[in-house]
């Protein structure tokens, strides 16, 4: 069976990154022909909603030193791609994931999806179909002063 991606998931600080990096290192040191593989190495794609932010290294489990195995840096993607305070959502993650995934596969490399943000992982593994939705400031302003009961009534009216 041809593998198109390996996924490693789990909670924060459970050793996912070091496992993914060690696995990528092993794959990178193999000759694909020797094991019947079709890939030339491996790279890691992060699936973490907080590691996308630059400078947020403490408390996010962004152990960048884990990406160096036996003195060689394992290439990684979707880490440190946004400034703190920038809104980054599931739609954007999914688009960035597909860009990284397609680039990696195009080069004949095996992607390793690694992280603990379940919704990010599920969105790519199950192929969620998402659409960009522009911000509607007028609607936000109209709803900002409503309490929960008023919002609930409005939602029920929309459903009927």
Ranges and model annotations:
Residues 1-160:
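Phosphate/pyrophosphate-binding catalytic cores of soluble transferases and nucleic-acid-acting enzymes
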